[in-house]
Amino acid sequence: MSQFAREIVRNAIYNTSSPDADSVSLRKATTTILLIGVTYCILVGIYRVTLHPLAKYPGPKLAAVTRLWHSYHLCTGDIVSVLSRAHEAYGPVLRIAPDEVLFISSRAWDDIYGARPGKPEMDKDTPLYKGPTAPHSIVTVDGELHRFYRRLLAKGFSDAALREQEPVIQRNINLLVEKLHKEVAAGKTPEMTAWFNYATFDLIGELAFGETYGCLENSHYHPWVEMILEVMKLRAMTHAVGYYPWIFHILMWFVPKSLREKFVTHRRYTHDKVQRRMDQKIHYKDLTTNLVDPQNGLERYEIDGNCSTLIIAGSETTATALSATLYFLTQNENAKRKVIGEIRTTFNNAGDINSISVNQLKYLSACMNEALRIFPPGPAVFPRRVPQGGDFIDGHWIPGGTQVGIAHYCINRSRRNFVDPDKFIPERWLGDPTYQTDDRHAVQPFSYGPRNCIAHNLARLEMRLVLARLIWEFDWELAPGSERWEEEALVFNVWSTKPLMIKFTPVAR
């Protein structure tokens, strides 16, 4: 720039000879800055939808330009229904953000989440796992540390350990049934999402810490359990804004202080529970035996973080699966009649229902699988990041650094994978030729690969035992007001559902 031009600019901006000149100069400077900013955003947007390496993958244009589209739907709770419709409109490969692509083919499970011999693992290097509110645990760490935590925890979820834990499981189920009989005798209509949460939180509390929360005994949520359910929803919000670290702390100030304090309280409660567990002598191998064993050398924050994850992952999701199975059986009277017949002709009394005998209930297992398909407990995307250098996913080249994933709800409800995907049809799991083209490998409710849910055996056992016992004890139907339970559910990483009111009638024997 010439000396003359520099002098003109200097005078335009810094000349203070008159107030009018100052005002004009300020307006000019502000306008220039705004124009530069707007022009930059427009150019970035054009680049992202035309020249960006992911530009060839279809999806909403706004999503290709800015992640705000994705974050908005995370916060409103309609994310999985929006993604499902987008997959229907754009196809099996869907761009949902400038740097994120989703898939709905079963092959993508292997490419993204499966073991990758000779290739680096697709890490959980995303705000969902690395955000400031994420605990340090088996879910969030990578590599050798994850494998170490998994080896320690696996012993508590082994078949041998589950056999040792069965008396604890049966005791909690007996109490659930007893309480439901009392509710029915008092003329009440139980809200089953709450009752299933009471049971699963009490059970995981006893298996992890050696003591229940007293939810079943007191017929209401323990304050800590209520807080956990709220914290889970807030985690979805922090996930949404975690993509904007430069404004994260500002945005968090808009979260009510009482809700922010729940994170701190949750950590304190976890710490106190762990301490009581460490002071106890448990006479069976529970879920935390190896975590608290000094010989394994874990730091206290590692023990607390993994215990916190056990409580959250081992309770609400199982309760959701139980609620979904009970609900969808009311939507298919033929399936309901079949599962009732199977259970009530297999057992002579409630005492016959145990961890061994429930394995012969093939139709009940099909009902569970179908409920897990149509209403997966973890319906959203649990993303991974493509390693540097890029890789092929389902035959598509994806650049390194891109977030990729599968939304369970979307892959399970896709017409590309299932006949009548929105219908609850247990027979699709029993060899019915009508559904022989179904891609059952697409359904992975407990995730997939070396980082799948370590507690899936416990969750399935709980479901079989609870459902078999309830169906043995009661006839049931939906109470008025719960007909749209599925349609009214929202997703904040996990489901947020309306009350599920069930009218129970004890079986006369």
UniProtKB/Swiss-Prot annotation:
The enzyme's first-digit EC class, named in words, is: oxidoreductase
Looking up SUPFAM superfamilies in the UniProt record yields: Cytochrome P450
Query: Which positions does UniProt annotate with glycan attachment?
Result: 15, 306, 412
Q: What happens when the gene is disrupted?
A: Impairs the production of 2-oxocyclopiazonic acid, but accumulates cyclopiazonic acid (CPA).
Supply one GO CC term from the record.
membrane
Q: Does the keyword Cytoplasm apply?
A: no
What transmembrane ranges does the database entry give?
Answer: 31-51
Residues reported to bind heme: 453
Report the pathway entry. Secondary metabolite biosynthesis
Care to name a GO molecular-function term for this sequence? monooxygenase activity
Topology with respect to the bilayer:
Single-pass membrane protein
Report which superkingdom the organism of origin falls in: Eukaryota
Q: What is its EC number?
A: 1.-.-.-
Q: Which InterPro entries match?
A: Cyt_P450 (IPR001128), Cyt_P450_CS (IPR017972), Cyt_P450_E_grp-I (IPR002401), Cyt_P450_sf (IPR036396), Cytochrome_P450_monoxygenase (IPR050121)
The record's keywords, sorted A to Z, are:
Glycoprotein, Heme, Iron, Membrane, Metal-binding, Monooxygenase, Oxidoreductase, Transmembrane, Transmembrane helix
Necessary cofactors: heme
As for subcellular location, the record says: Membrane
- Name the family: Belongs to the cytochrome P450 family.
The function of this protein is: Cytochrome P450 monooxygenase; part of the gene cluster that mediates the biosynthesis of the fungal neurotoxin cyclopiazonic acid (CPA), a nanomolar inhibitor of Ca(2+)-ATPase with a unique pentacyclic indole tetramic acid scaffold. The hybrid two module polyketide synthase-nonribosomal peptide synthetase (PKS-NRPS) cpaS incorporates acetyl-CoA, malonyl-CoA, and tryptophan (Trp) and utilizes a C-terminal redox-incompetent reductase domain to make and release the tryptophan tetramic acid, cyclo-acetoacetyl-L-tryptophan (c-AATrp), as the first intermediate in the pathway.
Protein name, UniProt field: Cytochrome P450 monooxygenase cpaH
